[in-house]
Amino acid sequence: AFEFDRMMQIPEVTGILIQPMLTGTELFVGAKYEEKFGHVVLCGLGGIFVEVLKDVSSGLAPLSYEEAYSMIHSLRAYKIIKGTRGQKGVNEDKFAEIIVRLSTLLRFATEIKEMDINPLLATEKYVIAVDARIRIEKK
């Protein structure tokens, strides 16, 4: 409470966002519009692993749950998602749900040309978006 009051004394401050410090496996979901195919949805490990491992799975929107699970299971890093060496896996159902919901959103928000949600922090209980980037093109 003291720190909140102190921060609110700063003239330019109009509000403060407070969120819990979370831990988990970093995941990634994204999308890119391709002229010939429509929206391509991507998933994989997130954070720096997207660039380092280049282990990404893709599918054409809209996606079914079966297709989302297939994307997840086809990743080379799937053992990390499943849980390995004593580490618990992530909630695959929630990860698949996010992939499906993103693909559904793209059917209706056609102005979205690129989208990255990276990282998603995932545990066996939750999958929560930490950061996102969206590029929109209006016609």
Question: Positions of the model-derived regions?
Answer:
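ATP-dependent carboxylate/acyl-activation modules
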Residues: 1-139
